[in-house]
């Protein structure tokens, strides 16, 4: 298995698909990376030379924010919103949907399992 950005990527898959196993790289960025490096789209990971793996690794380190750094930045952005006390920060703090979805019904994923209320059923 090739190890890129701290992630073991599967060797049997095509390079474009395998790169999407890295947090922060989707299909669009994976296409960009292999075009920059000059690897054919149909090439599989186990067919890559060490030099090509090194080029991919350097390109990702230089041009993209992935894995731990990306997760840290996302959590810091959410923490900043909560510290500001803005509406979005309050919604994050309370564990409710942030982007205007209804909560009277639905929103179970964000709110967690339903809590039983005593005397509610008749």
Swiss-Prot record:
Keyword Ribonucleoprotein: yes
Origin: domain of life: Bacteria
GO cellular component: cytosol; small ribosomal subunit
Pfam hit, one: Ribosomal_S13
Keywords associated with the record: Ribonucleoprotein, Ribosomal protein, RNA-binding, rRNA-binding, tRNA-binding
One of the record's GO molecular function terms: rRNA binding
UniProt subunit comment: Part of the 30S ribosomal subunit. Forms a loose heterodimer with protein S19. Forms two bridges to the 50S subunit in the 70S ribosome.
HAMAP family, alphabetized: Ribosomal_uS13
Family stated for the protein in its record: Belongs to the universal ribosomal protein uS13 family.
Purpose of the protein: Located at the top of the head of the 30S subunit, it contacts several helices of the 16S rRNA. In the 70S ribosome it contacts the 23S rRNA (bridge B1a) and protein L5 of the 50S subunit (bridge B1b), connecting the 2 subunits; these bridges are implicated in subunit movement. Contacts the tRNAs in the A and P-sites.
Descriptive protein name: Small ribosomal subunit protein uS13
Annotated organism of origin: Rhizobium meliloti (strain 1021)
């Amino acid at each position: 298995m090739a190890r890129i950005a701290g992630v073991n990527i599967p060797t049997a898959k095509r390079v474009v698909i395998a790169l999407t196993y890295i947090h922060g790289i989707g299909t669009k960025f994976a296409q960009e990376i292999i075009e920059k490096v000059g690897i054919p789209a149909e090439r599989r990971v186990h067919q890559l030379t060490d030099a090509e793996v090194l080029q991919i690794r350097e390109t990702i380190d230089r041009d993209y924010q992935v894995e731990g750094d990306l997760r840290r930045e996302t959590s810091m952005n959410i923490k900043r919103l909560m510290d500001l006390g803005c509406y979005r920060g309050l919604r994050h703090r309370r564990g409710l949907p942030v982007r205007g979805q209804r909560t009277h019904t639905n929103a179970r994923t964000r709110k967690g399992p339903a809590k039983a209320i005593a005397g509610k059923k008749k």
